[in-house]
Swiss-Prot record:
Catalytic activity, as annotated: Endonucleolytic cleavage to nucleoside 3'-phosphates and 3'-phosphooligonucleotide end-products
Protein name (database record): Deoxyribonuclease-2-alpha
Cystine crosslinks: C22-C161, C269-C349, C310-C329
Signal peptide: 1-21
C-alpha cells in the first residue's frame, strides 16, 4: 500500500485556526453529521472484519455513504472534528463524559451516574456537541492522538455531531445537570467558567435535586437547524421513550438500542403512541449491510409516520428508568429519510393493533 507523504498528510489533517465545528468526511466544516459504525461482521472485507467500517451522513451527503476509510483514522469526520483535543487546547474549553470512561485519573464505570456519553468542545465563538453510544471513547486530551477503542469494534455504534454557536451552550450545559454525566476529562477556565456556571456544576458532580425531573429545550445549530434535546435524571423513574418521548413528539416510535442488557423493556402499546423495539437493521442497496439489533450497541429512534429522528445514549431497560440520559431529536428531512428505511423488523406488542405487522419488514 502506498504511504502518504508528510506534506499531504499535514494538508489532510489541517484544521483552520478558530474554526471549532463538526467536520465532515470530505474535510469541510458541516452543520451536523451522523456516523454509524457497523458491526464487525456486517459485510466482507478486511476493514469490515476488524470492526472499523462505518456509514456517514450529513445534510449534503444524499443519504448514507461509505465512510472515508477506517473509523480509527484522524482524517475522517470523527478524527478531524476531535483533532483540537489533541493539540494546543489553551484557548478551548471541553468536557468529555462517559458512563464507561477510558482508564484515566482513576475513573471507574459508575452505575449511579447517568447512562450518557458525549463531548462538548468550544471556543469563544462556538463549537460542537457530540452525542454517542461508544464505551471508552474518546481518548482523554493527554493522549498522543485520536483513536478508536478496541473494545468498541465488535458491535454497531452511533455518533451525532452538531455545530452550535456559543449562545447555545448555556442550554446544553443545563441539560447535563439532568443527565448527571461521569466527566473523565475537562478544561473549563476563565471566561468559560463564568459564562457557563452549569458546566462547573456538572464537573463537580452536581445535578438537579428537585422536580421537574426532565427537561426539553430547543437548540439552534450554527446553520439555523432546529434540534430538540430531551434529558432526564434518575428520579424521573420511567423509560425515556415510552414514558415521555413518544407523547412529546406525538408519534409512534421505532427504537434501536442495546438488547443484551438485563431487564429489557418489551414494545409498549399501552398509550396512544406505540413504542416498538427494533430487531433488525438493514441499510439500503444490494450490498446492505444488514444485522440484528443484538449486534448493535447504537441508540436511536425514528417516527415511522412523522419526520422525527433522534440519536442519543439511552437504552430501554428497567435499570435505565432510574438513570439519567437523553437524546437529540430533529425534523430534518435528510436525517429522517436516511434512518426510516433502516428499520427492517421490530418486536410487536402482545396485543398490538395491526397498524404494525408482527416482526414484518418495514413498509415503504
Amino acid at each position: 500500500m502506498a504511504t502518504l507523504s508528510p506534506l499531504l498528510l499535514a494538508a489532510l489533517l489541517w484544521v483552520p485556526v478558530g474554526t471549532l465545528t463538526c467536520y465532515g468526511d470530505s474535510g469541510q466544516p458541516v452543520d451536523w453529521f451522523v456516523v454509524y459504525k457497523l458491526p464487525a461482521h456486517s459485510s466482507p472485507g478486511d476493514v469490515a472484519q476488524s470492526g472499523l467500517r462505518y456509514k456517514y451522513l450529513d445534510e449534503e451527503s444524499g443519504g448514507w455513504r461509505d465512510g472515508a476509510g477506517s473509523i480509527n483514522s484522524s482524517t475522517g469526520a470523527l478524527g478531524r472534528s476531535l483533532l483540537p483535543l489533541y493539540r494546543n487546547t489553551s484557548q478551548l474549553a471541553f468536557l468529555l463524559y462517559n458512563d464507561q470512561p477510558p482508564k484515566y485519573r482513576g475513573s471507574q464505570h459508575s452505575s449511579n451516574r447517568g447512562h450518557t456519553k458525549g463531548v462538548l468542545l468550544l471556543d469563544q465563538e462556538g463549537g460542537f456537541w457530540l452525542i454517542h453510544s461508544v464505551p471508552n471513547f474518546p481518548p482523554p486530551s493527554s493522549s498522543a492522538a485520536y483513536s478508536w477503542p478496541p473494545s468498541a469494534r465488535t458491535y454497531g455504534q452511533t455518533l451525532i455531531c452538531v455545530s452550535f454557536p456559543l449562545t447555545q451552550f448555556l442550554n446544553i450545559s443545563r441539560q447535563l445537570t439532568y443527565t448527571y454525566p461521569m466527566v473523565y476529562d475537562y478544561k473549563l477556565e476563565g471566561d468559560f467558567a463564568r459564562k457557563f456556571p452549569y458546566l462547573e456544576e456538572v464537573v463537580k458532580g452536581h445535578h438537579v435535586l428537585q422536580e421537574p425531573w426532565n427537561s426539553s429545550v430547543t437548540l439552534t445549530s450554527k446553520a439555523g437547524a432546529s434540534f430538540q434535546s430531551f434529558a432526564k435524571c434518575g428520579n424521573f423513574g420511567d423509560d425515556l421513550y415510552s414514558g415521555w418521548l413518544a407523547e412529546a413528539l406525538g408519534s409512534n416510535l421505532q427504537v434501536q438500542f442495546w438488547q443484551r442488557s438485563a431487564g429489557i423493556l418489551p414494545s409498549n402499546c399501552s398509550g396512544v403512541q406505540h413504542v416498538l423495539d427494533v430487531t433488525q437493521i438493514a441499510f439500503p442497496g444490494p450490498a446492505g449491510p444488514n444485522f440484528n439489533a443484538t449486534e448493535d450497541h447504537s441508540k436511536w429512534c425514528v417516527a415511522p409516520e412523522r419526520p422525527w429522528t433522534c440519536v442519543g445514549d439511552m437504552n430501554r431497560n428497567k435499570r435505565e428508568e432510574h438513570r439519567g440520559g437523553g437524546t437529540l431529536c430533529a425534523q430534518l428531512p435528510a436525517l429522517w429519510k436516511a434512518f426510516k428505511p433502516l428499520v427492517k423488523a421490530w418486536e410487536p406488542c402482545e396485543k398490538e393493533n395491526r397498524a404494525f405487522s408482527p416482526r414484518s419488514p418495514a413498509k415503504d
